[in-house]
Amino acid sequence: NSIKEKTTPAVSDKMIEEKTDYDTVKEFCDEKSKEIAKELVWEKYVSSAKVNKYPKEETKRYYDQLINYYKQLAAYNGVTLETMVSSFGGYKSVDDFFAYALSSAKSTVKEEMVVYLTVRENNIELSEEEYKKQGEELAKEYGYENLKDYESANGRSAIEVNVYTDMLIEKLLGEDEV
């Protein structure tokens, strides 16, 4: 058995309709362009903020979550953390992985700080109705049956950060003053 000829399928409306939630290539491309624009705008906004001091408790919480996740993954696969991060994670050493985990934790904390500061400085409030509406949309997007299941897995405050982030991105894209 061998591959004699490679054929790259043409992207068509039919393929898009069969493989995605979109009906046409244009719809798919338009939506993906919007998503990329949102990500780029948000990344630029967050990166423009300077953090003077990271709160230890929150940073440690996110750091520990990531470390514990990899420890559980290693245990599940019957390997050590060192094997897990070097063989499967692509890190040269456990110390490199720990440095990545700290950087990742700080990134998450910075993003939350930016969200809460921007929301507070701009008097942006999240009504219960808006929380439920956007929370349900996010729940579906992340593969949960409903908002209640999403809250059970992630907690209300994490969902609020996501909802506020989406609100802020819309304001930034809409060129509202933020």
Which residues does each predicted region cover?
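Peptidyl-prolyl cis-trans isomerase
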Residues: 1-95, 106-178
